[in-house]
């Protein structure tokens, strides 16, 4: 008899390619449920938080209905529920962002989200495939070895963790930047695994099966 697939809540913050993320989670072996219902988030085995667009818009999505979804996400993380953040779902883990300074993040990790500095000849947003390398944080979701693979990025802002030990992956766009973080039950990436073909699917599969 096949083992039951874990129920994975894909949090609907009102933006992001939710259908693509849900399909990728299903392909990785999870039972994806797209929802903004705090009760469903509280019951799910694991949590994926995607987001596209502006930091403030996604933060507002957490705060719809009196902030119950924000509290459900924080409670899930504090309770040890596996969390996988994608793009803005990574940035929301921090205290805030230079993009929308008045909007608070979840403050799970110390640090802020910064904008790439303008460099002659450098295109912003950073868009396309880029190589990643291992950072100090160790996680079973990322294979051993300095080079951790190529992933697809679309962003103008990047996380700047205060703790170097939270950095799981780095990449470079004019300057080195944090491409993923990991601590305990939390993993989040600035790139889009659902757009990153085999490398992205392998990463999601390790999350689903962990």
What are these regions (language model features)?
Residues 53-127:
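Cysteine-nucleophile active-site neighborhood
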Residues 48-50:
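Structural motif
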Residues 44:
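An anion/phosphate-binding loop that grips the pyrophosphate of nucleotide cofactors and donors
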Residues 95-173:
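Pocket-forming structural segment of enzyme catalytic cores
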Residues 175-182:
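Short, surface-exposed beta-strand/loop micro-motifs that present aromatic residues
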Residues 148, 182-187:
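Beta-strand-turn-beta hairpins that frame and shape the catalytic cleft
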Residues 4-9:
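Extreme N-terminal starter segment of soluble prokaryotic enzymes
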Residues 189-210:
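Acyltransferase
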């Amino acid at each position: 008899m096949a083992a039951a697939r874990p129920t994975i809540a894909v949090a609907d913050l009102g933006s992001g390619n939710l259908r693509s993320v849900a399909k990728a989670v299903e392909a990785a072996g999870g039972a994806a449920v797209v929802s903004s219902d705090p009760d469903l988030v509280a019951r799910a085995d694991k949590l994926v938080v995607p987001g596209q667009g502006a930091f403030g818009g996604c933060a507002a999505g957490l705060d719809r209905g009196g902030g119950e979804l924000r509290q459900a996400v924080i409670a899930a993380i504090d309770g040890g529920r596996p969390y996988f953040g994608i793009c803005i779902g990574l940035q929301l883990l921090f205290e805030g962002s230079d993009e929308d300074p008045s909007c608070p993040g979840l403050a799970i990790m110390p640090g802020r989200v910064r904008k790439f500095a303008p460099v002659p000849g450098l295109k912003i947003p950073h868009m396309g495939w880029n190589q990643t390398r291992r950072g100090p944080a160790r996680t079973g979701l990322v294979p051993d070895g300095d080079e951790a693979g190529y992933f697809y990025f679309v962003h103008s802002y990047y996380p700047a963790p205060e703790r170097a030990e939270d950095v799981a992956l780095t990449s470079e766009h004019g300057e080195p930047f944090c491409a993923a973080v990991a601590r305990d039950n939390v993993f989040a990436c600035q790139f889009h695994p659902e757009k990153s073909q085999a490398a992205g699917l392998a990463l999601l599969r390790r999350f689903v099966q962990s």
